[in-house]
Amino acid sequence: MTAAGLKSTPGGPLRGTVRAPGDKSISHRSMILGALASGTTTVEGLLEGADVLATAQAMRSFGARVEQEGVGRWRIEGQGGFLEPSDVVDCGNAGTGVRLIMGAAAGFPLCATFTGDGSLRSRPMSRVLDPLARMGATWLGRDKGRLPLTLKGGNLRGLQYTLPMASAQVKSAVLLAGLHAEGGVEVIEPEATRDHTERMLRAFGAEVIVEDQGGVRHIRLPAGQKLTGTHVAVPGDPSSAAFPLVAGLIVPGSEVTVEGVMLNELRTGLFTTLREMGADLVISNVRESSGEEVGDITARYSRMHGVVVPPERAPAMIDEYPILAVAAAFATGDTVMRGVGEMRVKESDRIALTAAGLEACGVDVEEEPEGFIVHGTGQAPRGGAMVETHGDHRIAMSHLILGLAAQSAVSIDEPGMIATSFPGFAEMMRGLGGDLVEA
């Protein structure tokens, strides 16, 4: 893609079978855990987007040998820990990457300075830095811990920490810091969030104890853990699969299958919600890959209706609300999405940008402080807008999907950032029959 915009135009049905790109969360973690481990870690199916590649480069900065051996195939030679980097660690746009890396780095007697692109530098890091500081790490940076900042680690104390918000990133940062904390750590999670870190720590040889106490998850990582290199097969990313699948639901006559999608119940809230809206979504060929359940998902054009999305479902679909809002724009009735204030501190204020983009395309949207309501008419929205994405890849892809089924074309201003999570997005959609061209 070039610096030009990108335009999607309504056309005929979408048909075909595609494979979802590797899961972004697991790709980040495979790099970080591989660098922390002793010995060789091999990865297949890695998402080779800009965010994950920034994490790979960061691991090199901390002393790991990281090499690409083929498309999606990588080898990490870990040293059993992190060394002090000789230069600033630039994490690009990778919010997951920088938060998890800071947690891992806090366990070692080193000093590291982190920065990122303009979007990442605007995002607060205090939610991760606060528990790390309670464990004994120190940091120096801007208001609310915004990048750039310098972190000094080592000599960490154990910690029992109750998450003040549902955040897998904060949980993971504490667990990674706890690998080298005296006394280990316990994270108390009032609302369940994605559990990839717990699963992958076990795969690398760590003891992780998870208990449900009255509906509250307690995750304990005893002291003295050692990680050993392993093989990771990265499943398809459900957050990325959402885009071609929703396209299949809203473009008349379409049938789209996405193969190899991870079906972890803490990541599939969108699919549950779409089915409640009346979507024809069929999951088949369910199997296990590297400790995660995966399957193939087929979406057929559907006449959907509005629903009230339970706020407690938000952690299982927090990145999918923009594309859910697109589906809701074609549904009949109101789709109510509340309890999603976390969207305001993602790569952009996703509540505001989703509402603004849909309204520009003729959709009636009611924005609230902690969510929004889409008033669907059951008809294709007008479209015809140039949507400002503010550098947010999910806002960009969501509105391009809308344009494939709207009454007239929809353009977005900055397609380049789509590569952070879904390199090949435009090519995949064209392969299914979608009309995407430079604007």
From Swiss-Prot:
Instruction: Fetch the PROSITE patterns from UniProt.
Output: EPSP_SYNTHASE_1 (PS00104), EPSP_SYNTHASE_2 (PS00885)
Recorded hits in InterPro entries, A to Z, give: Enolpyruvate_Tfrase_dom, Enolpyruvate_Tfrase_sf, EPSP_synthase, EPSP_synthase_CS, RNA3'P_cycl/enolpyr_Trfase_a/b
Q: What cellular component terms from Gene Ontology apply here?
A: cytoplasm
Task: Offer an example of a GO molecular function term for this protein.
Answer: 3-phosphoshikimate 1-carboxyvinyltransferase activity
The protein's matches in Gene3D superfamilies, at most eight in alphabetical order, are given as:
Enolpyruvate transferase domain
Q: Which SUPFAM superfamilies match?
A: EPT/RTPC-like
Q: Reaction catalysed by this chain?
A: 3-phosphoshikimate + phosphoenolpyruvate = 5-O-(1-carboxyvinyl)-3-phosphoshikimate + phosphate
Gene Ontology terms: biological process:
amino acid biosynthetic process; aromatic amino acid family biosynthetic process; chorismate biosynthetic process
Q: Where in the cell is it found?
A: Cytoplasm
Q: What class of enzyme is it?
A: transferase
Q: What is its EC number?
A: 2.5.1.19
Family from the record: Belongs to the EPSP synthase family.
The name under which this protein is listed is 3-phosphoshikimate 1-carboxyvinyltransferase
